[in-house]
C-alpha cells in the first residue's frame, strides 16, 4: 500500500508543471519546484522552490541530492540529462526513466528509435551537421521540406522551406532556436496531412497501458494553438495509433503519461514525436475528462489506481498569447470571456511576457466539436495581456 506524504520534485516549473504540482498536492504530496527563474508558474503553488541553472549538471545533482525526493519528474527539455542517470544510480526514481528523458529530448535519437529500431511509419528524413550538408540532403526529400533543430521546444527554430534558396536561412533559424550544443538538424519531407493528433498514453506500475481519447490539434510554427477532444478517427486509425504508441512507450519503459504525436494522412497513421510527460495539447483534458492528464500522470507515477477514464462529448482549447514584451503583466476581458457557458480560463501566472508567449488557455465544452471550438476561440479572443 502506498504511504503518503511523498516528496515530488519537478525539474521545470512551467504551466504544465503547475498543474502536476496541484494534482500532487491534492493527494498529499510535498512538492519542490525547480527552474532557471524565480516565480515560475509551478513555484507559485509548490511547497518549496529552487532556482538554478537547469543545464548545469553539478548544480542539478546537488539540488536533488540535498532534498532526496521520492520521485523526480522532468517537465522541460532543457536539462542536464546526464545528471538523471547519476540520480537513478543513487536510488532516486526519475520519471519515466533517465533513458526515456534523454532519448525523447533529441529528435534524432527518438526518430532513430521509432523509425529505425522499432520500424514505425514516419516521414522520410535526413540529418545535417552543417548548412552544406543540409543543401546536399534536402533535395532528395522533395519540396517543400521541414527543417528542425535536433533539440528544441515549442516549435523554436523550425522552418518550412519551399526550395534550395531558403535552406541557408532555415539553417540559421535552426541554430538560433536550438537548445543544447549539437549543431545538427533533422530535415523531413513535408507531409500533406489531414490531421495532427496526440494520443495520451499511460504506463502503470502493474504493466498495463491505458489510452485517452485522441486529441486533435493545430500548430503554428511548430507551436500548439488549439486542441479538441475527441478527434475523429476511424477504428483502424485508432488501432494503428494505439499499437505504435504502445510499442514505443514499452521500449522507453518506466511509468507515467506520454504524449505521442501522429499525423493522419488518408488511412495511414504516421509517427511524429513523443514527450515523456503531460502534453500542452492535453490541457483540454482539464475540462474534457473525469481525470485530467496531470491527475493521470500522478496516479501512474505513484502507483495509484485508474479505474476509468471518461471523456465529454466535445471539448476544446485555444491558447492566449502575449503580443508585446512586458516585464510585468495584467489581463483584461476575463469577465467577458467567462460569460460563455461551459467555459473556463487558465491563466498561467508567468511573471513576464514576450511576443507570442503562451500566457493562458481558454477551455470549453459543447454539444459537438464545432460548438466547443467556437466557444474556446471566442473566450480566448476576449482576453488581452497588458503591461502592469
Swiss-Prot record:
Please provide, in alphabetical order, the Gene Ontology terms of the cellular component aspect for this entry: cytosol
Q: Does the keyword Metal-binding apply?
A: yes
Instruction: Name one process (GO BP) from the record.
Output: 'de novo' IMP biosynthetic process
Q: Which gene encodes it?
A: purT
Q: Name one GO molecular function term.
A: magnesium ion binding
* The protein, known as: Formate-dependent phosphoribosylglycinamide formyltransferase
Q: In which pathway does it act?
A: Purine metabolism; IMP biosynthesis via de novo pathway; N(2)-formyl-N(1)-(5-phospho-D-ribosyl)glycinamide from N(1)-(5-phospho-D-ribosyl)glycinamide (formate route): step 1/1
Record-annotated residues binding Mg(2+)?
Answer: 261, 273
Amino acid at each position: 500500500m502506498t504511504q503518503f506524504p511523498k516528496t515530488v520534485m519537478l525539474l521545470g516549473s512551467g504551466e504544465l508543471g503547475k498543474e502536476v504540482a496541484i494534482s500532487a498536492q491534492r493527494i498529499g504530496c510535498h512538492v519542490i519546484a525547480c527552474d532557471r527563474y524565480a516565480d515560475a508558474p509551478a513555484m507559485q503553488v509548490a511547497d518549496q522552490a529552487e532556482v538554478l541553472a537547469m543545464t548545469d549538471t553539478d548544480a542539478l545533482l546537488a539540488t536533488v541530492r540535498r532534498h532526496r525526493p521520492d520521485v523526480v519528474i522532468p517537465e522541460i527539455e532543457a536539462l542536464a540529462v546526464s545528471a538523471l542517470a547519476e540520480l537513478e544510480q543513487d536510488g532516486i526514481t526519475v520519471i519515466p526513466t533517465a533513458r526515456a528523458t534523454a532519448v525523447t529530448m533529441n529528435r534524432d535519437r527518438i526518430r532513430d528509435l521509432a523509425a529505425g529500431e522499432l520500424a514505425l511509419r514516419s516521414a522520410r528524413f535526413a540529418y545535417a551537421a552543417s548548412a552544406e550538408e543540409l543543401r546536399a540532403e534536402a533535395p532528395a526529400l522533395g519540396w517543400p521540406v521541414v527543417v528542425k533543430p535536433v533539440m528544441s521546444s515549442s516549435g523554436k527554430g523550425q522552418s518550412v522551406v519551399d526550395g534550395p534558396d531558403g535552406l541557408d536561412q532555415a539553417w540559421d533559424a535552426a541554430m538560433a532556436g536550438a537548445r543544447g550544443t549539437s549543431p545538427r538538424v533533422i530535415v523531413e519531407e513535408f507531409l500533406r496531412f489531414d490531421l495532427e493528433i496526440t494520443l495520451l498514453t499511460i504506463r502503470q506500475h502493474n504493466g498495463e497501458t491505458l489510452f485517452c481519447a485522441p486529441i486533435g490539434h493545430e500548430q503554428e510554427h511548430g507551436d500548439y494553438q488549439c486542441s479538441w477532444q475527441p478527434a475523429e478517427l476511424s477504428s483502424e486509425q485508432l488501432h494503428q495509433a494505439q499499437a505504435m504508441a504502445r510499442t514505443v512507450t514499452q521500449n522507453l519503459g518506466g511509468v507515467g503519461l506520454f504524449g505521442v504525436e501522429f499525423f493522419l494522412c488518408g488511412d495511414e497513421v504516421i509517427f511524429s514525436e513523443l514527450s515523456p510527460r503531460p502534453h500542452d495539447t492535453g490541457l483540454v483534458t482539464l475540462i474534457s475528462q473525469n481525470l485530467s492528464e496531470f491527475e493521470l500522470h500522478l496516479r501512474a507515477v505513484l502507483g495509484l489506481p485508474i479505474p476509468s477514464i471518461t471523456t465529454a462529448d466535445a471539448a476544446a482549447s485555444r491558447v492566449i498569447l502575449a503580443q508585446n514584451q512586458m516585464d510585468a503583466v495584467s489581463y483584461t476581458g476575463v469577465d467577458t470571456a467567462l460569460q460563455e457557458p461551459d467555459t473556463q480560463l487558465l491563466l498561467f501566472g508567468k511573471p513576464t511576457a514576450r511576443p507570442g508567449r503562451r500566457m493562458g488557455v481558454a477551455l470549453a465544452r459543447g454539444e459537438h466539436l464545432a460548438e466547443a471550438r467556437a466557444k474556446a476561440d471566442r473566450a480566448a479572443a476576449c482576453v488581452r495581456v497588458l503591461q502592469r
